[in-house]
Amino acid sequence: MNTLSSARSVAIYVGPVRSSRSASVLAHEQAKSSITEEHKTYDEIPRPNKFKFMRAFMPGGEFQNASITEYTSAMRKRYGDIYVMPGMFGRKDWVTTFNTKDIEMVFRNEGIWPRRDGLDSIVYFREHVRPDVYGEVQGLVASQNEAWGKLRSAINPIFMQPRGLRMYYEPLSNINNEFIERIKEIRDPKTLEVPEDFTDEISRLVFESLGLVAFDRQMGLIRKNRDNSDALTLFQTSRDIFRLTFKLDIQPSMWKIISTPTYRKMKRTLNDSLNVSQKMLKENQDALEKRRQAGEKINSNSMLERLMEIDPKVAVIMSLDILFAGVDATATLLSAVLLCLSKHPDKQAKLREELLSIMPTKDSLLNEENMKDMPYLRAVIKETLRYYPNGFGTMRTCQNDVILSGYRVPKGTTVLLGSNVLMKEATYYPRPDEFLPERWLRDPETGKKMQVSPFTFLPFGFGPRMCIGKRVVDLEMETTVAKLIRNFHVEFNRDASRPFKTMFLMEPAITFPFKFTDIEQ
């Protein structure tokens, strides 16, 4: 397999670094000046015995099959809102906190190049197994410090500006039209329920949508070319990577000491996805060159073409990271939205009323203008993210010494921030067990929005290192939910008391044979 050569070095745009650096230095000095001998030492933070903790994950142990939310919540009950998860087998200790003041302290002191460790298996693969491809460009998932800052600055304008998404409105609508036809094909003609494995269909839809952005092509996995071998390889590997990461980097694992079967599977998975993505992008590059040689003027509007202009190597890495970070997480979120709406038909009816005003016919086109007028749609998605948090929280590595819950936490410590768990607590969200999209809208009487701590609602992270794909996911989710609810009344007639589990991210714990009834008008 030929590796795409690097035509140019990564463009470096530092932007308003001086003001950010000044703010970072100020925060550091404030944190440093507030540390006194009265604060407890790091060694006094509550924690389990290292060997008992390791034993809990072994066969027959308390956490053998536990999700990250289950075992961190169990430890929270035992040790309180802050505790240490002991490191082992080459992984350092992690401090875990559920205190919003701690979460704010960590973010306020993260500096201009926030550091997020925790995906060591991917970092090792990129640095030591395939340096021929990655070299100095590790991608946003794996890189740190100045290397991360240079890459993020180079690609921020591509992903974070709304104008970069304009060309995707129509093709994303077409992909969703195809998905609607797929639903009609596979649902039972009598019950109108889709098959038990419908989550696979949802994942194919998400993969198709993200693949459009990542590879400038439709893979055909929804209907047209369901057996496309290259696409299926990318589809399966993108789903496997997160599960393997959980086993290697979150749970205790000896892969840093000996080559375990799980790590060998991870290496094969990463290699397979890399080889296919290189092949696809090489085809794109060759096709683009032919068009240039034919005298065609090329307008680089797509995200992929703009990434290729920076560096073909960056295009390979970002295309992989889009799928790796997006397919399972977004597919699970879509399942959760449909479940919430099916279990709350009054909210579904209210959403459909909004959609009918924007989409008078089922095949009405969605565009940048009319999608601005869908506040209830966005509130539904936002409330779903709160009601079914997609993961435990996020991680940061302290850039300097800080005080967390009265304890001195030294520079270089990795902190697991349990912000997502707080979204289901009445302290921060009144009536937390109710699905209330209205909580995100302005009060019709006062015109005011609900006051929410920014450090309890962080589905896409916070600060300079927040998820770069947020706008892409927002567009995909809004398009899909709008299309589905405009075309169907959705029901779920099964038990949904525990529909999801959180391993590394949230994933389905049950099947979702939704009932899709056509809307007449």
From Swiss-Prot:
GO terms for cellular component: mitochondrial membrane; mitochondrion. The keyword Isomerase does not apply. The keyword Zinc does not apply. SUPFAM superfamilies: Cytochrome P450. Keywords: Heme, Iron, Membrane, Metal-binding, Mitochondrion, Monooxygenase, Oxidoreductase, Transit peptide. It is an enzyme of class 1 (oxidoreductase). Pfam families: p450. Its EC number is 1.14.-.-. Its cofactor is heme. Signal peptide: none annotated. It comes from the Eukaryota. Residues 1-19 form a transit peptide. PANTHER family: CYTOCHROME P450 (PTHR24279:SF120). This is Probable cytochrome P450 12d1 distal, mitochondrial. It comes from Drosophila melanogaster (Fruit fly). The gene is Cyp12d1-d.
